Amino acid sequence: VTAFQPFLDDYDIALARNNVQRKNMPTSPATRPRTVLALQGGGAHGAFTWGALDRLLEDGLEFSAISGVSSGAMIAAMAVQGFVLNGNKGAREAVSRLWRRVADAHIFGTVNSSLDWMWGWDKSMELGSELAWSGITNALRMFSPSQLNPFGQNPLEPLLSDLLDIMAIRHPSAPRLYVAATDVESGQAKIFDNSQITVDVLLASACIPMMFPTVSIHGRNYWDGGYSCNPALTPLLSPRPDRLVLIRAQPRARKGVPNSTADIVHRLHEIAFQAPLDGEIAMLPKQVRLLDISADAALARHPLTSKMNTEKSFLDHLFAAGREAAAPVTAT
């Protein structure tokens, strides 16, 4: 206990400071609607979610529960831990820190380097480019993902290990957090709550099996949660909220038929990831008001492969688009 006491003291000071700040805020009316938040996954397109959430938090919205999958799960975890330490301001700072680190790390560089033996491959290519995805598609015709990535590297692991604050997420004052991953063998969604959140859980929720190694947790194997729910809405409904804010990071519709192998694969993923969410939306109680923040307009002019583009300029563009798209919600 002694070894950890300085850290715990600092942690308690931060929590106490947050409590004082929140006490000095105007008292919320008793009729204030109970609001929950659902964050869709979408790779780099999650920067749109970042922007939308930043606007909601800036305008004072508070969420009693957050559900996320894939990149949405990482945003949800950062928001929850940031809120515990410094309210909405802390949540905004924590999510921003995540995306700045993603941009600085060129997060898919590790995957690129595993393909540099291929003729014509340049590991400096962004995975968000058509040429890069053509190379990956060709490689996967000849080799399994484990052969392309024999050491099981996941570029997100060191980043999340550095950023994730499990103590904050598990603090009694934390908003409820739900992260979904897909059980490989059963095909069912596994929902992890605050008490179960770890780096491995976030990696599992974002595990695209054609790119990253399958994540094993307590003897079960998991892939991206988007295959089974994108994100899970049901856990947010008990106790029943007044409003559910859904931030999408994938377009529901795209004009035209994709022709390249890369675009076909990505569109298939978008359609597959959309179906579970549509089913849950259809089952929402009529008393719950759905506030849907769509990414359709923001993503319409970008190629399907752009979800792998972690260039800072692109992430900043999506961040700005997300803030703009969220404006009507904050006015309601």
Give short role names for the model-derived ranges.
Residues 2-69, 77-332:
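Patatin-like phospholipase
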